[in-house]
Curated annotation (Swiss-Prot):
It catalyses: 5-methylsulfanyl-2,3-dioxopentyl phosphate + H2O = 1,2-dihydroxy-5-(methylsulfanyl)pent-1-en-3-one + phosphate. Binds 1 Mg(2+) ion per subunit. This is Enolase-phosphatase E1. Pathway: Amino-acid biosynthesis; L-methionine biosynthesis via salvage pathway; L-methionine from S-methyl-5-thio-alpha-D-ribose 1-phosphate: step 3/6; Amino-acid biosynthesis; L-methionine biosynthesis via salvage pathway; L-methionine from S-methyl-5-thio-alpha-D-ribose 1-phosphate: step 4/6. GO terms for molecular function: 2,3-diketo-5-methylthiopentyl-1-phosphate enolase activity; 2-hydroxy-3-keto-5-methylthiopentenyl-1-phosphate phosphatase activity; acireductone synthase activity; magnesium ion binding. Monomer. Pfam families: Hydrolase. The keyword Transcription regulation does not apply.
């Protein structure tokens, strides 16, 4: 049967976690007040504002309070869909204005080309929105990598710690579990993918990272698919 598709986590796997924590997150926190003020009547932004009120159980929160809630969620690294959607919109402006480039590990840049040449399907699964993932890979320091991908998944597919999310991915891409390899640095995500029947591999780029009973690699150079 063999592996026919690879699903990659982003932060800590294809992308340096420091880029997300030290560049992207602070940028979104700083930009949120003006962005919401200027775009509050945009339908998508308006829906995110309403969803934030619902999740926070503050139906009467004004725009300033909604901004505070969202900024607090950033500091807590909450995986709330309205926050992730808004961050994607804000980062789109940042990329467009040349404020930063998407950091991608060089070994993944080479590997994704190799996998594509092998006719392997490549997907990403992140708590960041699909739009944010596309921005990351299209504005990467290795150029535009989006044509190498067959698709992207985010919190709308499910929580990355839940088995059902990986079952949903399998249903979407129409492959059997053993034909799909999931690569992540997070043990709990690997356990959830394994529970769904997927093949798994832990990316260990940091020697201090907590590891589990999974196949381990420290670079995509070590990931050879026959």
């Amino acid at each position: 049967m063999g592996i026919r598709a690879i699903v990659v986590d982003t932060a800590g796997t294809t992308t340096d976690l420091n880029f997300i924590q030290d560049v992207l997150f602070p940028y979104s926190v700083k930009a949120l007040p003006d962005f919401l003020e200027q775009n509050q009547h945009n339908v998508l932004v308006e829906n995110c504002i309403c969803d934030t009120r619902d999740i926070a159980l503050e139906p009467d929160a004004d725009l300033a309070r909604v901004t505070e809630i969202l900024q607090q969620w950033v500091s807590e690294d909450r995986k709330a869909t309205p926050l992730k959607t808004l961050q994607g919109l804000i980062w789109k402006q940042g990329y467009a204005h040349g404020e930063f480039k998407g950091h991608i590990f060089p070994d993944f840049i080479e590997a994704v080309k190799r996998f594509s040449a092998q006719n392997l399907r490549i997907y990403s699964f992140s708590s960041g929105s699909v739009d944010a993932q596309k921005l990351l890979f299209s504005h990467s320091d290795g150029g535009d990598l989006t044509e190498m991908f067959n698709g992207h998944f985010d919190t709308r597919t499910g929580n990355k710690l839940d088995k059902q999310a990986y079952c949903n991915i399998l249903n979407t891409i129409s492959l059997s579990p053993k034909q799909v390899l999931f690569v992540s640095d997070v043990i709990e995500e690997l356990k959830a993918a394994e529970a769904a029947g997927m093949m798994t591999c832990q990316m260990v780029r940091d020697s201090t990272l907590r590891t589990g009973e999974f196949r381990k690699i420290s670079s995509f150079d070590e990931l050879l698919i026959e």
